[in-house]
């Protein structure tokens, strides 16, 4: 099977959906003339023209409001944020209009829109460009929240998101745009609201999403050298959460470790831990454990960045703790 970069998978998803449906269009900062800040939309202006690939001012609240209004009037916008850190300026439109309009209108007015862009840390970018936002948006009823970890899932889920009739928050990662993975040439869609088992195992379940899947899979490889077989699950869709797949894995392994790039309080791991202990308490042979980013803004110095984020060695250590192995 061919291998393409993450950015190419996203581009193909948008191109295919824009060819299929003339109501789909892309707008955001530098998406047209500059081919996108991360070159995700490269060549799309030439193919679709300036009415469907639209450069915007640096005014997130304003252009998000235009897109939300377009969605409420029958179009299907894709809004690219250069980073989700900047999208907080548009939160009024995402929270108070896009997520609520279907309920406020008694089901008469929908908002089929995709908000997408880079999320979380990407090295030494400082505190204001390094926040992971999955849990914040997942706390909003009316939104669907997707956070992808590889090109195959990115393409299949973005196509599904563009076709979805609800507003979808679609989170990527700046550090993954150049990474390559297998993506078939034929069309496919992936289901929103499903976890994906990326590695089967019997001893412990490790759950993660977005670029922390690298940590989860890397930890599983290290553990395998010691005879510990970890089952690794990519959540992929944060809301609606497919806790059932996680529960079925825990029924087999009896242990759960969650890895996420977010602050610990009121996080995605908090929700997963609550749901699994509620529905599967009798299957647990150890407390559910998690590894998150530090409960502080992310600093700039490389040693502090390394200390802030989850890593493979800390994850391996945590797995051994839930297996009651010697430290």
What are these regions (language model features)?
Residues 1-167, 171, 306-307, ...:
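Thiamine diphosphate
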